């Protein structure tokens, strides 16, 4: 499982010009799921992301978690994170999870993130063509890969 985390001041996702999810301060999470991903991978990421201290404290140091600032999440499914670009110029997405499997794991990830963090989790729509807009904060961008824990 791969997740790209971006610290944001605000973000929203639209489908067919309709806003389906929006947040103020928090994280945008781009979530890529592989067929080998498990519930253990989900919980590893949920704990790491919820407890990650990348928000500034009163002295300007990255010392606060999203829970400390009572932020929110915008979670977006993104199979293209699993692109293989080793051969040729066209990416291969054979490493991405089967859509039925991936949709279930993505929903489980979002549910566990809500339960563990106690914070709101806005989402896009799995498999949809989405427009995501955001205002980066920092910028702070961190890549998580459960195959490299």
From Swiss-Prot:
Belongs to the DTD family. The keyword RNA-binding applies. Homodimer. The lineage of its organism: Bacteria, Bacillati, Bacillota, Bacilli, Lactobacillales. It is found in: Cytoplasm. Its main location: cytoplasm. InterPro entries: Daa-tRNA_deacyls_DTD (IPR003732), DTD-like_sf (IPR023509). It catalyses: glycyl-tRNA(Ala) + H2O = tRNA(Ala) + glycine + H(+); a D-aminoacyl-tRNA + H2O = a tRNA + a D-alpha-amino acid + H(+). Gene3D superfamilies: D-tyrosyl-tRNA(Tyr) deacylase. One of its GO terms (cellular component) is cytoplasm. It comes from the Bacteria. Its EC number is 3.1.1.96. One of its GO terms (biological process) is D-amino acid catabolic process. An aminoacyl-tRNA editing enzyme that deacylates mischarged D-aminoacyl-tRNAs. Also deacylates mischarged glycyl-tRNA(Ala), protecting cells against glycine mischarging by AlaRS. Acts via tRNA-based rather than protein-based catalysis; rejects L-amino acids rather than detecting D-amino acids in the active site. By recycling D-aminoacyl-tRNA to D-amino acids and free tRNA molecules, this enzyme counteracts the toxicity associated with the formation of D-aminoacyl-tRNA entities in vivo and helps enforce protein L-homochirality. It is an enzyme of class 3 (hydrolase). Disulfide bonds: none annotated. HAMAP family: Deacylase_Dtd. This is D-aminoacyl-tRNA deacylase. GO terms for molecular function: D-tyrosyl-tRNA(Tyr) deacylase activity; Gly-tRNA(Ala) deacylase activity; Ser(Gly)-tRNA(Ala) hydrolase activity; tRNA binding. A Gly-cisPro motif from one monomer fits into the active site of the other monomer to allow specific chiral rejection of L-amino acids.
């Amino acid at each position: 499982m791969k997740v790209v985390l971006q610290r944001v001041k605000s973000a929203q996702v639209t489908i067919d010009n309709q806003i389906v999810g929006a947040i103020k301060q928090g994280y945008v999470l781009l979530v890529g799921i592989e067929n080998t991903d498990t519930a253990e991978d989900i919980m590893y990421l949920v704990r790491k992301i919820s407890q990650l201290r990348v928000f500034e404290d009163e002295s300007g140091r990255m010392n606060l978690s999203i829970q400390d600032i009572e932020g929110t999440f915008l979670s977006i499914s993104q199979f293209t994170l699993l692109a293989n670009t080793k051969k040729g110029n066209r990416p291969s997405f054979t490493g991405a999870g089967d859509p039925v499997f991936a949709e279930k794991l993505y929903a489980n990830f979002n549910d566990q993130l809500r339960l563990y963090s106690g914070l709101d989790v806005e989402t896009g729509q799995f498999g949809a063509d989405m427009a995501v807009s955001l205002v980066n904060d920092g910028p702070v961008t961190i890549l998580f890969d459960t195959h490299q824990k």
